[in-house]
């Protein structure tokens, strides 16, 4: 009897500094997915960007200790060939690399082997080369359905500068900020404080998980923060500190997105840094649901969906915002201010995205099921749109009509 299960490629790892976070998220997705409905193929991306066919038991064994989690050695390399009938093929095993053998060494090379066709890809990737539109573009070229926002939504949300400008133009409040395009052009500490007040957050424009983010309270802090941020990106944001509560909302859907109940992050560190998120088990208290009145809860959910739509998101995203407890420039106390939108949020044991949906009545396996169905529905919708092939046929028909007249 043929296997009727949907075949899902779980794509994880990657080149970004958030590699380990991706591995932790992938472990949870792999363990939670309904095996009666889905047949999974593990595709690991190493730190050099190479794709590998990963063995599930080996990966889960290496992932059992979060302090030593790593992508295990995999002998089979993979390549994706784009087109309307995409193929994932195995290539020369890793053991041949570095052997000194040339392409014409005379030794017979193994023929590429094609893997069974995948129905959908679940990218469990974080940061650059994962959630910034690059992988999404490759999968779109291959006509492979994939979970999460498309190329535009992924790219826009990854770039904090572009995202904030689009949100601001849509009438959605964001923290006052300055964009710096090179270390040499950075304003002095006094100039930055005059524009934004102190303390100031310094952030790489295109990183996630608070990687490279610093809070500057003095000139010395500021100079170190700039050096650190520019080591991760060529564009850096200087951002005014919003004094308030950190609220997070999970959003799910395509044309008609839904918002979860709000949760709250109460950091025990100076801010919710990478260390607080992933290295210190006591780095923050996660409060679900957030202690908000009904009116504020409704406002928060509404602005989360507005932001999701304004930044062209589909599938899923986690919307991070502040509930201001003090006035911030023109924004009064009580304002809801968007911090950022994470298009491929974490799925680790402490991650808010699945936790918020679980508290909203959507279990982890059901959430994965809905995300996969949304990916397939979107791909089917997009495939119905007119293509260059379709337009060529229309053009030829019109040309024939014009000639016959």
Region spans (language model):
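Phosphate-binding site of ATP-dependent enzymes
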Residues: 217-302, 323-337
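Hydrophobic beta-strand scaffold residues
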Residues: 40, 145-146, 174, 200, ...
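Basic phosphate/pyrophosphate-binding loop/patch that engages nucleotide-derived ligands
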Residues: 166-174, 228
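ATP-binding N-terminal substructure of ATP-dependent carboxylate-amine bond-forming enzymes
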Residues: 1-147, 151-152, 156-158, 162, ...
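ATP-grasp fold ATP-binding core
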Residues: 167-168, 193-211, 233-243, 247
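Glycine-rich phosphate-binding loop of ATP-grasp-fold ATP-dependent ligases
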Residues: 22, 174-179, 200-224, 246-248, ...
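ATP-dependent carboxylate activation and anion-phosphoryl transfer catalytic cores
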Residues: 2-6, 12-15, 35, 171, ...
């Amino acid at each position: 009897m043929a296997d009727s299960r949907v075949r899902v490629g779980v794509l994880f790892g990657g080149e970004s500094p958030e590699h380990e976070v991706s591995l932790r998220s992938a472990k949870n997705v792999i363990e939670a997915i309904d095996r009666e409905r889905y047949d999974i193929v593990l595709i690991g991306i190493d730190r050099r960007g190479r794709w590998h066919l990963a063995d599930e038991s080996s990966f889960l064994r290496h992932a059992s200790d979060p302090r030593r989690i790593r992508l295990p050695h995999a002998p089979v390399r993979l390549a994706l060939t784009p087109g309307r009938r995409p193929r994932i093929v195995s290539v020369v095993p890793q053991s041949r690399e570095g052997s000194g053998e040339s392409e014409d060494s005379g030794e017979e090379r193994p023929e590429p082997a094609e893997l069974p066709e995948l129905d959908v890809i679940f990218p469990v990737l974080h940061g650059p080369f994962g959630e910034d539109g690059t992988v999404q573009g490759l999968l779109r070229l291959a006509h492979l359905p994939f979970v999460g926002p498309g190329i535009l939504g992924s790219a826009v949300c990854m770039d904090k500068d572009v995202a904030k400008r689009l949100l601001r133009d849509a009438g959605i409040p964001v923290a006052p900020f300055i964009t710096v395009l090179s270390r040499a052009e950075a304003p002095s500490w006094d100039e930055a404080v005059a524009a934004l007040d102190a303390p100031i957050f310094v952030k790489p424009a295109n990183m996630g998980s608070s990687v490279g983010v610093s809070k500057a309270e003095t000139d010395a802090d500021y100079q170190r923060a700039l050096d650190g941020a520019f080591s991760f990106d060529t564009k850096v944001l200087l951002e005014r500190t919003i004094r308030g509560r950190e609220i997070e909302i999970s959003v799910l859907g395509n044309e008609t997105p839904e918002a979860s109940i709000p949760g709250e992050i109460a950091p025990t560190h100076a801010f919710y840094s990478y260390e607080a998120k992933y290295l210190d088990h006591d780095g923050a208290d996660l409060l679900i649901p957030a202690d908000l009145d009904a009116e504020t809860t409704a406002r928060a959910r509404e602005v989360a969906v507005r932001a999701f739509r304004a930044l062209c998101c589909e599938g899923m995203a986690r919307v991070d915002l502040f509930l201001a407890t003090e006035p911030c420039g023109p924004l009064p106390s009580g304002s809801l201010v968007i911090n950022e939108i994470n298009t491929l949020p974490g799925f680790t044991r402490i991650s808010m995205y699945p936790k918020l949906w679980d508290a909203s009545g959507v279990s982890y396996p059901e959430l994965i099921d809905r995300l996969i169905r949304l990916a397939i529905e979107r791909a089917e919708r997009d495939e119905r749109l007119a293509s260059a092939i379709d337009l060529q046929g229309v053009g030829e028909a019109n040309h024939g009509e014009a000639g016959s007249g």
